[in-house]
Amino acid sequence: LGFTFHHHPMLTYWQDHFYVLCNACPVHEERGLTEILLMKSGNGKDWSSPEIVFPHVMCKGEPTFCNHRMGFYISPSGKLLASTAYFPQSEMPPQSGSEDTGKKYFGVAIREINKDGSFGKIYFIAQNNSLYAENEFPFPYYTESDDPGLIAACESLRKDKLITLHWWEQIRPENFDFPESLTDQIVDGNRKFAKAISYYHRNDGAVVALWKNSKSALSYDEGQSWTDVVNLKTFSGGYAKVWGQKTEDGMYAASWRPLGEGSWGRYPQLWATSKDGIIFDGAMHVNGEVIRRYDGGSKNIGPCNYQRGLYEGGPDIPGKDVWVVYSMSKEDIWISRIPVPLVSSSEKYVMEDFESIKGIGDLKAWNVYHPQCATVEMEQTDEIQNMCMKLSD
């Protein structure tokens, strides 16, 4: 599209492919025409060209914008739904204060992604009926679909107390049943509340929620209720996202940006590991590049913009790696594959024979930085018929 702003990336794995969606704006965050883009990949490295899955639409003569806290849902029957939230241009707060509680969203929209790559119709799965009349919504409600399978998938999503917590700042509490420990935070002028949830299950059954603004809480009943929201002083992410998950080796991993309050930078991307999901240590650095290519408003520099991995409960992926997608300075969308177990150093001198590997992904003890315009590949030389590493720029 030629846009220079890309943000809010989301990741899932379905039908043997990775899927990523993100929002795109011409120059500034949520200014001008906005679209939601979708890409897919069979290996996580080579990606399709972006397609517009949620378009910019006009509603009653007024442009609409869209962004999201969640991007995908895979139903029990195997349907893949993409998701975003729409709001009218007139409800976009001034650039100096764009917190989501200041926007009067139409609601949360979904769209089915079919196995052949085509898209279904766009429907609202949750809408703010207290803010808008029925004829003011740009899309129909999901119950108007003629596909019983889609309706069942939407109702399954609506009943999921953990996933729908992504919506709580976009759907007014009177329209949806959210825990008071969250909704009580919505007060005038408060930007530092819990939003953009990431969660994982501990071995004792507790659900650990990690939110933007270094907030956390526990649930012992699958999101029906929560403990009081507290500040995590050691996860000093400032006004940025935190990602946490359980890894295939039975450990836990969390990613955050270490720069605290008052810093505009979102770098480096740190990860720490934990045996119990409570105490994290061994901080390691995955991506510390600070790339800025274009001008634009609300563009924090660095790779810690909306890092998101694969949520619990999805299909099994090939291998045991951790995958994380993120926005570099809210411009380019990156994805990292982190081998499990997560380690910060090699215990011995690295001796890997290029002749014994098929591709760059087979290197176990290397950190490979592989942008599209400066690729790193393994190839066979013509002269000596052996494998070498080729760096292109």
What are these model-derived regions, one by one?
Residues 6-8, 14, 27-77:
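Blade-loop segments of beta-propeller domains
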Residues 7-10, 66-72, 196-198, 240-243, ...:
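Beta-propeller and closely related beta-sheet repeat lectin domains
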Residues 17-21, 78-82, 204-208, 250-254, ...:
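Entry beta-strands of beta-propeller and related beta-repeat scaffolds
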Residues 35-44, 96-116, 216-217, 268-277, ...:
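Beta-propeller blade signature
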Residues 58-62, 233-241, 277-314:
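Conserved blade-ending motifs and adjacent loop-strand segments that build the rim/top face
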Residues 58-138:
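Asp-box/WD-like beta-propeller blade repeats and closely related beta-sheet repeat scaffolds
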Residues 236-287:
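Loop/turn-rich, solvent-exposed surfaces of beta-rich toroidal or solenoidal domains
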Residues 358-392:
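Extracellular glycan-recognition surfaces and repeat-rich motifs
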